């Protein structure tokens, strides 16, 4: 069974220590609820990942663990087969002892768009909401973060993260918790909170913004990336049914509307630092994610539209600062 004891130990003398009042019981219940299904099979695979300490580790410019020269061809093939059990791999890419995991998303491209605009992560405590397999968490560590915590309720994503962590060495202060943000108490402790690719999946985007705010210390920084559409501060798209074949997309605001939402939630220093139309090169099917991808979600006769006729995916990154609460509104 995947253990969270090292995380408890790392936060016992940190700004997150009060989380220990509730977190062990929540994760204990999660473990009891997942004794069956795919998780036990995946954990057996994780237990087979015994490899020498990597001769190269790079989280600054990529996520690379090992040069590939430490393993024989047979050992590398075995590793590739083990990692293949965790398909589909959506966020990456990873280079693991010479095994190149070409994921559906070029998450490194998103990181390169975002990182020049954020406050330096050196010595900061960071939360990544909806972290997926944890690719960006490793890049946050590469920027010098003191602690990185990722939350995502997916057992598969957790096992993908654990596979990478076991190959990297478990001593790194990067931890995945299989939780949704609604399961977190107001911690008021993180220096930076990332929410990238989550907001449009939430039925109540304002509530989600408040949940993000509750995790930040006063003066902490929010990095919010989500789907947007063109328009003024009153423009919000609510898909009638599906958007890009997804049935869990609820609200797509304009950039101005999104910034207004953040202002209403008592954030300051709100700025849009990037707007980018998702390209077919950034999101596509690969050997490691052989299912449908972006090209299948767009109108074959007009890639500026989804198959439903809505504007094709465009993503904006907004950065904002948690303000002191306005006591007149409490």
Swiss-Prot record:
Protein name: tRNA U34 carboxymethyltransferase
Function (record text): Catalyzes carboxymethyl transfer from carboxy-S-adenosyl-L-methionine (Cx-SAM) to 5-hydroxyuridine (ho5U) to form 5-carboxymethoxyuridine (cmo5U) at position 34 in tRNAs.
Family: Belongs to the class I-like SAM-binding methyltransferase superfamily. CmoB family.
Catalytic activity entry: carboxy-S-adenosyl-L-methionine + 5-hydroxyuridine(34) in tRNA = 5-carboxymethoxyuridine(34) in tRNA + S-adenosyl-L-homocysteine + H(+)
GO BP annotation list: tRNA wobble uridine modification
UniProt-annotated binding residues for carboxy-S-adenosyl-L-methionine: 91, 105, 110, 130, 152-154, 181-182, 196, 200, 315
Organism of origin: Shewanella pealeana (strain ATCC 700345 / ANG-SQ1)
EC number in record: 2.5.1.-
Assembly and binders: Homotetramer.
Keyword Transferase found: yes
Record has Transport as a keyword: no
Gene Ontology MF terms: methyltransferase activity; transferase activity, transferring alkyl or aryl (other than methyl) groups
Keywords: Transferase, tRNA processing
């Amino acid at each position: 069974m995947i253990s969270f004891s090292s995380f408890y130990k790392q936060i016992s003398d940190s700004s997150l220590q009060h989380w220990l009042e509730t977190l062990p019981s929540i994760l204990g219940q999660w473990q009891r609820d997942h004794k069956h299904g795919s998780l036990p099979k995946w954990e057996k695979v994780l237990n087979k990942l015994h490899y020498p300490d990597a001769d190269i580790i790079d989280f600054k410019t990529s996520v690379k663990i090992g040069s590939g020269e430490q393993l024989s061809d047979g050992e590398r093939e075995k590793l590739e087969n083990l990692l293949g059990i965790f398909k589909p791999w959506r966020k990456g890419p990873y280079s693991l002892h010479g095994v190149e995991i070409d994921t559906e998303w070029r998450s490194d491209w998103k990181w390169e768009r975002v990182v020049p605009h954020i406050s330096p992560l050196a010595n900061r405590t960071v939360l990544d909401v909806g972290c997926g397999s944890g690719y960006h968490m490793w890049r946050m560590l590469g920027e010098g973060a003191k602690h990185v915590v990722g939350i995502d309720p997916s057992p598969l994503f957790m096992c993908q993260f654990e596979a990478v962590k076991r190959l990297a060495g478990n001593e790194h202060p990067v931890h995945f918790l299989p939780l949704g943000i609604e399961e977190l108490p107001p911690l008021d402790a993180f220096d930076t909170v990332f929410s990238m690719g989550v907001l449009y999946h939430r039925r109540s985007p304002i509530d989600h913004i408040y949940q993000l705010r509750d995790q930040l210390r006063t003066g902490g920084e929010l990095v919010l990336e989500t789907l947007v559409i063109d328009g003024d501060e009153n423009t919000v798209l609510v898909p009638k049914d599906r958007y890009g074949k997804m049935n869990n997309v609820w609200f797509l605001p304009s950039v101005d509307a999104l910034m207004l939402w953040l202002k209403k939630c008592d954030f300051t220093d709100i700025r849009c630092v990037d707007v980018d139309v998702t390209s077919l090169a950034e999101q596509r099917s690969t050997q490691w994610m052989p299912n449908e991808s972006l090209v299948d979600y767009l109108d074959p006769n007009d890639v500026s539209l989804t198959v439903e006729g809505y504007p094709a995916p465009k993503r904006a990154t907004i950065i904002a600062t948690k303000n002191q609460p306005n006591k007149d509104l409490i």
